[in-house]
Structures are given as C-alpha cells and as structure tokens.
Design a protein with these regions (language model features):
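Residue-level signal for inorganic ion chemistry
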Residues: 21, 64, 217, 242, ...
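Metallo-beta-lactamase
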Residues: 48-50, 55-57, 118-121, 126-137, ...
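Short active-site oxyanion
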Residues: 48-49, 74-78, 241
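Histidine-centered divalent metal-coordination motifs
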Residues: 80-86, 161, 217, 279
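Aromatic/hydrophobic pocket-lining residues that form the small-molecule binding cavity
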Residues: 87, 198, 202, 276
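Active-site HxH/HxHxD metal-binding segment of metal-dependent hydrolases
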Residues: 36, 55-149
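C-terminal regulatory/interaction regions
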Residues: 4, 244-305
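Conserved beta-strand hairpin/beta-sheet module of binuclear metal-dependent hydrolase folds
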Residues: 8, 12-71, 167-182
C-alpha cells in the first residue's frame, strides 16, 4: 500500500453532505488499514440506501439512525464486501429498520478458482478480517439495477480486493469501496484477494466515463481515470520489481517484500508480503515464475521469463 497524505479528517458520527441526495458518515475505526475509518454512505432523500454500514459499533449504528430526517426511512442496506470494517453492522441495522441486506454473496462468493484451491490447501488470510457470519437477505448480480424512490444504483462486480467485492454506479459517480481509494493502493491478499481479478476490475472501471469515485476509506477521488491509470501502472511497476529481483536469485514473498517495500512501515510489512504473494500467484498463472513445489505463501519462487 502506498500512503498519500491528505487533509481528510472528518468527525466520526457526523453526516456530511457530499452531493444532493448523498451523505457520508465516518465510522469510529481508524487504523493503518482503514485510514480515518470506514465511510458509510446514505443515498436518497426519501427511501435511503445505506452503503457499507461498517463495523460493529453502537455509536455508529445510532449515528446512522439519527441521520434519518423526517419523512425518510432506510429502505436498502447494501454491503460492498465482507471485510469486518464494512459488513458486520448490517445485521443490527436491519433489525432496527426492517430493511433488507443486499450484497454479492457470503464471504466465499466470487472467489476465483486458484484462490479456492489455495484456501482448500490451508492458506489462511493475512488478518484483514473476514466476516464469515455474513449472509445477505438477497444476493446481487453483476449488472443488476437497484431502484430506490429517487435513485438507482448499478451493481458492478469488481473482484480483486475480495472475491465478493462490488462497486456501485450512480450516474457519473461510483462507490468503489476498497477497490479504488485515493489515500492508498488497495490490499490484495490471497486467498481472499486475487491480483488477476483486481487488474481486470481496474480495466473494467477504466472503460467508463466516471466523474468521481466515493471510496470505502478516505476522501472522494476527483480524477477517477487518472487514479485508475496510476493503480494499474503501480501494479505493473511492482511486477517488474519482483521479476528484476527474481532475475538475481530465487526468493520467497517475505524476502521480496523486504527488498522492494523499503519505505513501508513495520505495521504494514505483513500486508506488503501478502501483496507480493498476490503478484507471484498472478505471475505463476502467466508462466513467468514458478514455485519450488506446490503454490503456497512460503514457497521460493524462480523466474521463468
């Protein structure tokens, strides 16, 4: 992850208007992985869609409920993906409002074949926090249109950060959750994240004429195309760095991470190692590197091409 300093520092629990019919409430869960906290969005002026309720927090639940103005009700609860900083509060919010919970699926939904094989072989996640208890009231399909009284959202399946990750198109704006953010590059951590899927999802979003991205963490991204170009170039540069290192000698993901992520703080080195392994899985699939034996996080990889 590459951290980009900015002046984004809203008050947790306070609803901030971003555009007509759109407000954001920051959850009180800052961390090196969540930046200032999770962005919860309220869309609509009558029937409200809550996008990413956030982590379990009584204070955040109350802030969402308090943001409902006279004549408004929460009609939809939409979860972009099942990391524990985005989905767990959905159940309590549904109990409080009666609104259905919509998402692409449970924690396993959308997982690629190679990541399923890694998971079945015993590879555990890197501690990002998967909400294994999550089950939506209704599963969404790619391309589906969700209708509210005065809004509609297009479901765009964007696997990569997580197999069940979706973005939500709202006219020329897009809620990109953790796939595209301005403050950092997205974590891709096998067996839940797949870099091949991530790059394909970036290209898919790049082919659309967006004016603004509303991310899961951090400030709005005002140059969507430029940010996507940067993310794609950043990943390709990481790939070149890995291949250059492997041209010198075979190495593990851990060794490569410490050689390449020289400016990354210690708390984020574990995430860096998972990102490197994601690249190695992708490069293995492209027959550019090979592990010594089975594909696994601790394998030593050598360059083939």
């Amino acid at each position: 992850m590459v951290l980009t300093p900015d002046d984004f520092n809203p008050t947790p629990g306070k609803a901030v208007a971003l555009a007509p019919g759109l407000r954001r409430i920051l959850a009180p869960n800052p961390s090196p992985m969540t930046y200032r906290g999770t962005n919860t969005y309220l869309l609509g002026t009558r029937d409200l869609a809550v996008i990413d309720p956030g982590p379990e927090s009584d204070a955040h639940l109350q802030a969402i409920l308090d943001a409902c103005q006279p004549g408004q009700r929460i009609s939809h609860i939409i979860v972009t993906h099942t990391h524990t900083d985005h989905s767990p509060l959905a159940a309590a919010l549904a109990r409080s409002t009666g609104a259905p919970v919509l998402a692409f699926g449970d924690a396993q939904a959308g997982r690629s074949d190679v990541m399923r094989r890694l998971a079945n072989a015993g590879l555990a996640g890197g501690g990002e926090g998967i909400d294994h208890e999550f089950n939506p009231d209704r599963s969404l399909s790619d391309g589906e249109i969700i209708h509210g009284a005065d809004w509609q959202l297009e479901v765009i399946h964007t696997p990569g950060h997580l197999g069940n990750h979706i973005a939500l198109g709202w006219d020329k704006a897009c809620f990109t959750a953790d796939h595209v953010m301005g403050w950092a590059s997205s974590l891709v951590s096998p067996p839940d994240g797949d870099l091949s899927d991530f790059m394909a999802s970036c290209q898919r979003l790049r082919h659309r004429d967006w004016q603004v991205f509303h991310p899961g963490h951090g400030a709005p991204v005002l140059d969507p195309g430029g940010r996507l170009d940067w993310l794609i170039a950043h990943r390709l540069a990481r790939e070149r760095s890995i291949l250059d290192e492997l041209a010198t000698s075979p190495a593990t993901a851990r060794t490569l991470a410490r050689r390449i992520y020289t400016e990354t703080s210690t708390p984020l080195l574990g995430a860096a190692e998972r990102n490197v392994f994601a690249h190695l899985v992708d490069l293995t699939g492209k027959s550019m590197v090979a592990p010594d034996g089975d594909l696994r996080a601790t394998a030593t990889f050598r360059r083939l091409a």
